[in-house]
Amino acid sequence: MSQTRKKTSSEGETKPQTSTVNKFLRGSNAESRKEDNDLKTSDSQPSDWIQKTATSETAKPLSSEMEWRSSMEKNEHFLQKLGKKAVNKCLDLNNCGLTTADMKEMVALLPFLPDLEELDISWNGFVGGTLLSITQQMHLVSKLKILRLGSCRLTTDDVQALGEAFEMIPELEELNLSWNSKVGGNLPLILQKFQKGSKIQMIELVDCSLTSEDGTFLGQLLPMLQSLEVLDLSINRDIVGSLNSIAQGLKSTSNLKVLKLHSCGLSQKSVKILDAAFRYLGELRKLDLSCNKDLGGGFEDSPAQLVMLKHLQVLDLHQCSLTADDVMSLTQVIPLLSNLQELDLSANKKMGSSSENLLSRLRFLPALKSLVINNCALESETFTALAEASVHLSALEVFNLSWNKCVGGNLKLLLETLKLSMSLQVLRLSSCSLVTEDVALLASVIQTGHLAKLQKLDLSYNDSICDAGWTMFCQNVRFLKELIELDISLRPSNFRDCGQWFRHLLYAVTKLPQITEIGMKRWILPASQEEELECFDQDKKRSIHFDHGGFQ
C-alpha cells in the first residue's frame, strides 16, 4: 500500500504545537528519524504522524503540552519495545507476543492514528477477550481498509463486538478472521453490517469451524459484495452442506479473482454444483480445490464450465483422488486455459497410468511457470510424454517431480528441458530413485552453464547414488551461483558415511554467494571431516546452516 507524504493546508496554523513536538523528536527520536529519511520507500515519518495527529479533528485534544508530550513518549516506548516504528497508515503487530497490558497500550495508541488504513494483530493469543476495547475505538480509525485478526483466540463476545463495529469502518476492503473457531456459528453476527455497496474486496475465513448455516448466510450475502475479489473458505468441512447456497451467491460475484475451497469436504456432487457457477466467474485468476479426497470422479461429466475461466492463472487439484475418467475429462479442458501459470496435480496416484494425453498437451500452455506433479505414480509412458512436452515450457520456474520412481535412470529424457530452461528456479527430484548416471548428467548440465537461475535443488532420499556420483555433482554445483537451498539428505531408515565428495561440497559452498541451507540428514561424518565443518563455520562470516540432524 503506497503511503506518500502529503502536506495539508493547515500546516501553518499548527506550527506552534508542531514545533514543540519536533523538539521532542530531536531528542529521543532523532536517530530514528534519520533512519527513516534514508529509506525512500519507507512509510510516513514519525514527525508527519504526530503533526497529522495534532491537526486531526478526530483525535481528542490534550489539555496541555505536558500531557501531549507524555502520551507521545508512552506511545513511542510501546512501539520501540515491539521493534516497530510510528506510522500513520499501517500498524503491523503480527505475531508480536502481545500481552494483555500491551493490548491496553495499543488501544491507547489508536486515537493518535486517525489516518490508519491497516491494522494487523494476527497470531497474538491475548487479543481474545479484549477485542471490545478495540472496537469501541473504531470510530477513531474510520479510514481503516485492512483488518487482520487471524489466530487471535477470539471469543463469542469478541466476534459480536466486531460485527457491531463494522458500520464505523465503511472503507474496509480486507478482512482476515482465519483460525478463530468461535467465528463458526456466529458469521451472521460478524458480517451483519455488510450491506449492498460494501467496499470489501477480500474475506479470509480459513479454519473457522463454519457451520452449514454460516454457509447459507454467506451465500445470501455474496450478491451484496460486488467488489469482492478474494474468498477463502478453506478447512471448513461443514459448509459443504450449504454449497448450493454459496454457489448461487458466487454467480453474483463477477469480479471474484481468487476462490479457495481447500479441504472443505467437497464431493463428486460438489463439482457439479460449482461448475454451474464457473460460467459467471470470468475474472477468476486462482481456483484451489485441493485436499478434497471425495472429489474423485466429480470431473468425469462436469468440467465443461472450467473452460470458461479464460483468465485462470492458478489451478490447484492436488490430493483430490482424481480418477482415470477425471484425468481424461480434464485433458479436454486444461490445455485450453492458455493463461495458466501454476498447475498442481500432485498426490493423485491414478494419474500414473492415465495422464499421458494430458501431460503431452501441456505444451499448449506457454505461460506455465509452476508444474507440480509429485507423488503421481508416473509410469514410463506418462513420464516420456511429460518430458517431451516440458521442452516447450520455456517460462517454467518451478518443476516438482518428487516421489515418481520412474524418473530414476531416465533423467536423460529431461536433458533438453534442463538445457533450455532459462528461468528454472526450483527443481525437486526427491525420492525419484535417481542413480549415479542421473546425477552425473545433472552435473554435466550444470558444468556447461545451464540452470544458471536455479535457487532450490532437492535431491534428497535418492540413496542409490554412489560416492563417485556425489563427487561429480559436488565438483560442479559451484557453478549454480544463485543457489540458496540444496538438499541431499538420506532416507530416515538409512545412514551412510560421507565420502571424499564432502570436501568438494565445502569448497563449492565458498563459491556460492547466496547459499544459506544445505540438507545432509543421516550422512555420517568422520571426526576429521566434522572438524573441517567446524572450522568452516568459524572461518566464514556468512550464515550457512548445514541441516544434518546431528551427525552420527
UniProtKB/Swiss-Prot annotation:
Residues 31-41 have a biased composition (Basic and acidic residues). Pfam families: LRR_6 (PF13516). It comes from Homo sapiens. This is Leucine-rich repeat-containing protein 31. InterPro entries: Leu-rich_rpt, LRC31, LRR_dom_sf. Residues 42-58 have a biased composition (Polar residues). It comes from the Eukaryota. LRR repeats lie at residues 227-246, 255-275, 283-293, 311-331, 339-360, 367-387, 395-415, 423-443, 453-475. Keywords: Leucine-rich repeat, Repeat. SUPFAM superfamilies: RNI-like. PANTHER family: LEUCINE-RICH REPEAT-CONTAINING PROTEIN 31. Residues 1-65 are annotated as: Disordered. The keyword Glycoprotein does not apply. The gene is LRRC31.
